[in-house]
A protein has these predicted regions:
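Bacterial N-terminal signal peptides that target proteins for export
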Residues: 1-11
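Extracellular/periplasmic carbohydrate-active domains that bind, remodel
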Residues: 20-455
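Bacterial N-terminal signal peptides
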Residues: 9-19
Length: 455
């Protein structure tokens, strides 16, 4: 018998395994949405159960999980997403915002997606030249409790891979995400409370593992990312960019980050083979260059980001190892602010320690503020990074001021500037402390800048 576990001190009941609801497989070429949805509904109505997807391809539109149901993908099973947006009934959040996914749960409790099978998002069937066309996520949970995601593979989602919104008491373990349809194909995006992400392997075209806050009134807190591997063309481990409310008590520990394995060169001519998980002959693959940032902690939308721990990170293949940014993007509603409590436009209490590896770009790590947000109480400890020197560059030093407070917060912000350090640049930040921080020039390279510059 499974025992309840405790996650962040909150008791989380283990999902109860009862009699499976058996569903016969079809030929794998016509949509099976209605059949699988009926099985899910029947299991929930019976008080709970396990719906098993057998080996083989199973084309489907959007499936809605119900309370007390586990969707189990047997080894060799593949849910193949329909390429027709009409097969995804939108889920509304915040009144009008619509979301779609291959597998979704909305306001349900005690649910799971498990097994050694695969969810194939069929991204190439969607028209990326039409940005207005809906792009369904792979897995979506909104306003749910006691959710477990274990062991399955999610490949080539049209939108975000795993999208978690306002969920609590959740475990994501040993999930593999391999998704490279282009921009906005994040691996795992989290907005919730009491969540553990452990031993996952994420390879994504956009940000790999990301914690966000869209709702001023909903604190995002108590999130642990542990033992994960991240590959990204953009950013590996990230808090932001959406930072409208509170994000607190988040840790990334014992993780590795490397550059993404693959990405598409052109988002327009997509192969449209419903059942083929690999691009058709002639599809424009190419190996991408380094990712943008490995460790990214941001507060740019007027929120509060605090008590962040990043520890024991091995990295290679990113232009900027550490990017900590306070900003002031347009669109913040000042009527929401509670400046008397020091809550808004605040980025504080961040500890980054035991980071080692090799950078793959000439933009240094940065701790910077702009506009109404200055990072405060930032600790960098036991950091050992190899940096490729830029040589004897006589270009005058320059860096962005408050005129860039609303710029998109990632290391590309500094591309048109010549920062005055090759290892770490600190500007408009308070209480930045360093202990045993080493930036070593790569063998055979030089750099006329100092390793560290604090303004």
């Amino acid at each position: 018998m499974n025992r309840p576990m405790k996650l962040f001190g909150v008791a989380v009941a283990a999902i109860m395994a009862v009699e499976s609801v058996a569903v016969a497989s079809t030929d794998g070429h016509r949509l099976e949405t209605a059949k699988w949805q009926a099985a899910i509904d029947a299991a929930s109505a019976a008080g709970g159960g396990v719906v098993e997807i057998p080996a083989g391809d199973h084309p489907t539109g959007m499936l809605r999980l119900k309370s007390n149901v586990e969707l189990r993908l047997q080894e060799g099973a593949r849910l193949v997403a329909s390429g027709d947006p009409a097969d995804y009934k939108p889920v509304k959040m915040h009144g009008s915002t619509e979301f779609r996914a291959v597998v979704a749960g909305v306001s349900v409790t005690n649910v799971a997606v498990t097994g050694k099978g695969e969810i194939f998002g069929n991204a190439w069937a969607f028209d990326y030249a039409r940005r207005s066309q809906p792009k369904p996520s792979g897995v979506l949970f909104i306003d749910c409790r006691m959710v477990r995601l274990d062991d399955f593979t999610l490949r080539d989602a049209a939108g975000w891979g795993v999208d978690i919104k306002k969920c609590e008491d959740m475990v994501i373990r040993r999930v593999k995400v391999d998704s490279h349809a282009g921009v906005c194909t994040d691996g795992i995006d989290i907005e919730g409370r009491n969540i553990l992400i452990e031993d996952c392997d994420v390879d994504s075209g956009d940000d790999a593992i990301c914690v966000k806050s869209h709702d001023v009134g909903y604190p995002v807190e108590n999130i642990v990312v542990r033992g994960c591997s991240a590959r990204s063309h953009c950013n590996a481990f990230k808090i932001g960019t959406a930072t409208h409310g509170v994000i607190r008590n988040v840790s990334f520990v014992h993780c590795r980050a490397f550059a993404a394995r693959r990405v598409y060169r052109d988002l327009a001519p997509m192969p449209k083979d419903l059942l083929n998980s690999r691009p058709v002959k002639g599809a424009p693959w190419y190996l991408c260059g380094p990712g943008f940032g490995c460790i990214n902690v941001e507060c740019v939308d007027g929120g509060l980001v605090e008590n962040i721990v990043v520890d024991d990170i091995e990295m290679e293949g990113y232009r900027s190892p550490i990017f900590i940014r306070g900003g002031d993007r347009r669109g913040f509603n000042d009527s929401h602010a509670d400046t008397s409590q020091g809550r808004w436009f605040t980025l504080r209490n961040v500890v980054v320690s035991n980071v080692r590896g090799k950078a793959d770009g000439r933009t240094p790590s940065t701790v910077t503020g702009a506009g109404r947000c200055r990072p405060c109480n930032i600790v960098l400890k036991d950091i050992d990074l190899e940096i490729p020197g830029e040589g004897e560059n006589r270009k005058p030093y320059s860096w962005p001021g408050d005129d860039k407070a609303g710029a998109y917060p990632q290391t590309t912000l500094f591309d048109s500037y010549h920062l005055p350090a090759y290892g770490l640049f600190v500007d408009k930040a308070d209480g930045v402390r360093m202990d045993n921080v080493k930036f070593r020039l790569r063998s055979g390279t030089t750099d006329s800048r100092p390793a560290i510059c604090e303004k």
